[in-house]
Amino acid sequence: MILRRCLLALGASLLTVPAWAGAQTDARMHAVAGRVLGTGGQVTRVADYPGMAVYHQAGGGFAIVSRDEKAPVVLAYSPDGQFDPSSDNPGFNWWLGAIKGAPHRDPILPDPERFPSSVAPLIKTKWGQNEPFRYMCPFLNYEPDLSKYGIYLPDTTHNAVGCGPAAMAQYMYFYRFPDHGKGSRSVVVKYDQSNVTLTVDFEAATYDWDNMLEDYSGGYTDQQGEAVAQLCYHAAVAAQTNWTRLGGGTFDENILNAMIEHFGYNDSARVLNRPLYDDVTWVEMIYESLSKGHPVLYSGKDINFEVGILVGHNFIIDGYDENGLVHVNWGWHGQQDGYYDIATLTVGKLSFDDWQGMYIDLYPDGDVLRGDVDGDGRVNISDVTELIDYLLSGNSSGVNLAAADVDGDGIVNISDVTALIDLLLTH
């Protein structure tokens, strides 16, 4: 199995665009970007890559448009996100490398007889791996010697969380589950060339969901910072993260086992590998999970040839649009979050289809108070109000989605309102 590492210091470099046979004109590409971004501000081209260009809107938002006529016109877009060509967002850079090497094809649209035409993004958090998320992670002064590759990493107060634990933390905050973990776990890290054992007793911890913020960029109190730092650190230890200052790495199996054994998620959850499924089946499994209100933890990996290691990335797919693009939360403080073509990444020069996986049926187990939608430990009329507000707005902040699935069919919808009212009338 391949160790997943999130490189934190390797920025994306801009590449010279070659001449492409049958390439779209710049004017046409600019017009396409303008249509998808709307009229919120002036649209300008900010980056060029082989086969594609990136357009940014002054009022916020960006679009990545294909240069090759045979490719889908819009490969990715964000209605309000910012595109930074120097970003070291590892998940986004993985997608960028994969899409450049993939033979493009028509998108796989959601089947209207089985799925909604679109699902708005489920994840509201814009969390990452640095402050305050890494406050409880260890300080490590040991790392592989990368100076011969021209990579020099500065000292940091605490090691970064790692992309796997960061995705786990956002995922658990979405469900606001659990209140506390199960069992304990130890990991060994290296400090001053010595092994140091870190142990977490998950049973003794309480996760302070109410003091966690969806976005920490606007400032936070010590209590708010500590609440999310504890969750991230516990996720990292539970997943047996291997830390160096280069990043934090773990395995898909470790993440899955941590979610089941230490955080009480459904024990029938599993990790699927893309080569075992045809394109339509793969994408429709994503649509099905999202249409039931469950985000999809996703993984991708590639090779960093400079360093000579396989690099893994974990992120969350939490929505899709009517054109077959899925919404991705990269776990990088909101940077480049938006809609992306994942279906195209099936064959490439590095066989990116072999290097993709997703977690299915990963949601809280049944040991929650059914109907306690607002998470106050009681089931009453306020839970009905909270559930209706969620269904109307799509805003899951403060909503215990595990408890909101009152009828137990795996979907949170209007039938759960009826089931909740029946529950109140019969108890």
Model-derived segments and their meaning:
Residues M1-R5:
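Positively charged n-region of N-terminal signal peptides that target proteins for export
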Residues D365-H427:
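Cellulosome-associated attachment modules in secreted, modular CAZymes
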Residues Q42-G59, N257, E261-N329:
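Active-site-adjacent substructure of cysteine-protease-like catalytic cores
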Residues A19-A23:
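Boundary at the C-terminal end of the N-terminal hydrophobic targeting segment
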Residues C163, M259, I317-G319, V328, ...:
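Residue-level detector of buried hydrophobic side-chain packing
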Residues C6-P18:
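Bacterial N-terminal signal peptides
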Residues Q24-A47, Q57, A63, E69-E131, ...:
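Cys-His-centered catalytic/binding microenvironment captured across papain-like cysteine peptidases
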Residues P50, A71-G249:
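Active-site-adjacent structural segments surrounding the nucleophilic cysteine of cysteine proteases
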